[in-house]
Design a protein with these regions (language model features):
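Serine/threonine-rich, low-complexity intrinsically disordered segments
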Residues: 7, 14-15, 33, 42
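Bacterial N-terminal signal peptides that target proteins for export
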Residues: 22-48
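Low-complexity, intrinsically disordered or signal/transmembrane-proximal segments
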Residues: 4, 9, 16, 24-25, ...
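Noncatalytic regulatory segments and standalone regulatory/sensor domains
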Residues: 60-63, 181-261
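Generic short N-terminal amphipathic or hydrophobic helices
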Residues: 11-12, 30, 39, 53
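Active-site-adjacent substructure of cysteine-protease-like catalytic cores
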Residues: 137-190
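C-terminal motif of bacterial Sec signal peptides marking the signal peptidase cleavage site
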Residues: 55-58
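Cysteine-nucleophile protease catalytic domains, especially the papain-like/related folds used
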Residues: 60-144, 148, 154, 223, ...
Length: 261
């Protein structure tokens, strides 16, 4: 008959062997767990660093050294506002600029001088032409945001064109820049149906450049712009003279001569 009696020494060896295997497997599990969590933590740290860098880029300031010399916040609350989307808001914006110079007018009264409807493709040129016919200087500005804000800080609203709409559909729209907040990095526009329409510096600059970076002042011949460019002012005076406003053009030249002394 087979002997099924247990050998104590053999049993002890078996138990010890099983215990060693169990400890070895547990050690492997612990190593794998540490490796997994170490890898996960490393990946998480990498993502956090990347997110931080992206956030820093996204939050980078658009305030230039020129802007830092301007007041923190300006709003020209007295600029008249005419609401409307017709003809890219061109007649409304021009009426606002003329009314700001004490001209009694409305957008409807400007349709005929602007040759609307029919001359929508010449709206930019005709808006400047009509402003000159009223005896005003049309002074073009540089394609830099700080140049526009400098004029607003001096009390002069800026007539401009920017691109408005969604990513799928955009169209140019005329507007009047009436204010800004340098701390919040926002501008205020009278545009279309919106009075005091707020846009971030970055969003506005992009929309403005998409529409050609066009911006002008409509000034009395006696009103020199802030940091006036003499050559540009004289060219504006020449354009005013060619529109039949020789006396106003002469006044503009005399104003410059007095202002640069």
């Amino acid at each position: 008959m087979p002997d099924y009696t247990l050998n104590p020494q053999s049993s002890m060896i078996g138990v010890q062997a099983g215990s060693w295997v169990a400890r070895h497997q547990l050690k492997r599990v612990n190593i794998l767990s540490v490796s997994f969590y170490s890898g996960t933590a490393g990946a998480l740290r990498s993502w956090l660093v990347l997110a931080l860098l992206i956030g820093l880029v996204g939050c980078s300031s658009m305030v230039t050294p020129e802007m830092k010399r301007l007041p923190d916040r300006v709003e020209l609350t007295s600029v008249p506002f005419f609401r409307g989307n017709a003809y890219q808001s061109g007649p409304m914006v021009l009426a606002s600029m003329l009314a700001n110079q004490q001209v009694q007018t409305t957008p409807g009264l400007l349709d005929k001088p602007l040759q609307l409807p029919g001359a929508e493709d010449r709206l930019e040129q005709n808006m400047q032409k009509v402003a000159r016919e009223y005896g005003f200087m049309v002074y073009p500005l540089d394609g830099q945001l700080h140049d526009l804000l400098t004029q607003v800080s001096a009390g002069y609203p800026v007539m401009l064109r920017f691109s408005q709409g969604s990513a799928l559909w955009k169209s140019p729209r005329y507007a009047v820049l009436i204010g800004y907040n340098r701390v919040k990095e926002t501008v205020l526009l009278n545009a279309g149906m919106d009075r005091r329409y707020s846009m971030s510096f970055s969003r506005f600059t992009s929309a403005w450049k998409e529409a050609g970076s066009w911006a002008v002042l409509v000034q009395s011949p006696r009103q020199l712009p802030a940091n006036v460019d003499q050559q540009r002012w004289l060219q504006a005076a020449e354009a005013l003279s060619k529109s039949g406003q020789e006396q106003a053009a002469g006044e503009a030249k005399r104003t410059l001569a007095r202002g640069v002394k």
